[in-house]
Each structure stands twice: as C-alpha cells, then as structure tokens.
Design a protein with these regions (language model features):
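Acidic/histidine-rich, metal-coordinating catalytic segments
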Residues: 59, 77-94, 117-119, 171-174
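Mobile-element integrase/transposase regions
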Residues: 1-44, 50, 66, 74-75, ...
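Mobile genetic element proteins and their domesticated derivatives, centered on retroelements
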Residues: 20, 43, 49, 68, ...
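Short small-residue beta-strand/loop micro-motif enriched in glycine and branched aliphatics
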Residues: 49-54, 114-116, 140
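RNase H-like polynucleotidyl transferase catalytic core
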Residues: 84, 103-126, 142-145
C-alpha cells in the first residue's frame, strides 16, 4: 500500500512559506445590505509559524500579487520558496505559454513558486490547519459591519494569533520563534526587503 513520504519542516526562517485563500463566512457579516463576498489570504512561514493575513473583496490573480507584496513588506524579507495550491489566483488551469501574474511577481522578487498536486490540500497542511484555527478563534465570534471593520478586526486578530504558544514550537509563540531563529543566525541568508521603498536591500 501507498505510504506518503514523511514531511520535513524547514528549520530556517524564510526557507519556505505556504499560501492559501479562504472564504470569510457570510454569517459573520452583520450588514444585511452587504452582498459582497470577502476572502482571507494567508501566508505562513513554515519554520517560525508566523503568519500574515489580509482581507480582500475578490480572489483574482492581481489580488494574489498585491497580497504577495504586502506579505513581503510585513515579514521584511524575501522567502526562498512559496508553496500554493493550483487555484486560479496562483496558476492557470490549462497549459499555456503565458506566464501567470503571480509567477511573474515571484520571479521579480527572486522567489521560487511551487504548486502542490491537485486535490492534495494536506500538502499545504500548515496553512490549512491555521485556517481551521481561525474558524474557532476568530470567525466563530466575529461580527463585522463593512470591509474596513473586517480589516481592522483581522489586523488585531493577526497580532493576537502570532502571540499564542504552539506545541510544535516547544510552546514558543511564532513571534518568539522568529526572534529565537534570528538570535541563532538562522536568517542570515535572507534578503531583507525595504518596507518603505519596496526594494530588495
């Protein structure tokens, strides 16, 4: 019988990140006149488990590119690899000579973009599990009134969630793990990213 290969989590911060999108549950929207759908983009560093999340009104490829730049600005460095599923935000469904906008953005930043095999969400397990935690910790209690309110509440939740101790990190928080990895020199290979100018330093 087939046995999946054991997955080895990167030990270096920025070596690999997982990126995914989830729907914001409609029932969280307290404004009955608002018919918009909202989407949460999420990226997680595999080594530190630090995340960045941001809400959008669509999940197009151009939105994915915008999120990529926001994420790099948030983390302050360029990751080596970003792994996604094969959603339309990140890849074309059919083979084509055209380069996807998300691939172009990754190429410009020097990031390797890897996609998982179709119908294998477990291969993006860390970001998938983080979404389940979001449902329990955030969306289960969330009521927002407009897009700006959603963004503000999501921003506060992100700060809180990055400061919760995690068993895989020996009960360190993602923020503490980031500082630990920096102190051990396990980030020296990363290219820093200037948040003000949008340039690689």
């Amino acid at each position: 019988p087939y046995k999946p290969k054991k997955y080895h989590t990167p030990k270096l911060m920025g070596e690999k990140m997982q990126l995914d999108v989830k729907y914001v549950p409609r029932e969280c929207n307290a404004n009955m006149w608002d018919d918009n759908r909202y989407y949460q983009f999420t990226i997680i560093d595999e080594a530190s488990r630090e995340r960045f999340i941001y809400a959008y009104k669509d999940h197009s490829s151009f939105t994915a590119v915008d999120f990529l730049y926001r994420a790099v600005c948030y983390f302050g460095y360029i990751p080596r690899i970003i792994q996604t599923d094969n959603g339309q935000e990140f890849a074309y469904f059919q083979e084509t000579d055209r380069i996807h906008p998300f691939d172009l953005a990754c190429e410009k930043l020097g990031i390797i973009h890897k996609t998982i095999k179709p119908r294998t969400p477990r291969h993006n397990g860390k970001v998938e599990r983080s979404h389940r935690s979001d449902n329990e910790r955030f969306y289960k209690h969330l009521r927002f009134y407009d897009y700006e309110d959603l963004q503000e509440q999501m921003k506060r939740y992100l700060c809180r969630s990055n400061n919760i101790g995690m068993t895989p990190l020996n009960y360190r928080t993602p923020v503490e793990m980031r500082e630990y990895l920096i102190s051990r020199g396990m980030t020296d290979y990363l290219e820093p990213f200037d948040k003000k100018t949008g340039l690689i330093l």
